[in-house]
């Protein structure tokens, strides 16, 4: 039987995994220049992902027009997921 701590950890891990998918979607859609980021659902996607990604802008300079902030952001989230997964109690 799982206790409350495991439930909180599993919910947090699931949220972080969904957030990684949102970042990947935002990153993939960035290659399409005709997308209007002020129309729905693109506006909501950018409002959810851009504040986090902006934390990492400028950490590494762009190379050949490629922004590395999503890679840094996803790596950090993945590291946090790994730390939280280790705290889960085995069944």
From Swiss-Prot:
Keywords: Chloroplast, Plastid. It holds the Pfam family YGGT. One of its GO terms (biological process) is nucleoid organization. It is found in: Plastid, Chloroplast. One of its GO terms (cellular component) is membrane. InterPro entries: CCB3/YggT. It comes from the Eukaryota. Belongs to the ycf19 family. PANTHER family: PROTEIN COFACTOR ASSEMBLY OF COMPLEX C SUBUNIT B CCB3, CHLOROPLASTIC-RELATED, YLMG HOMOLOG PROTEIN 2, CHLOROPLASTIC. This is Uncharacterized protein ycf19. It comes from Cyanidium caldarium (Red alga).
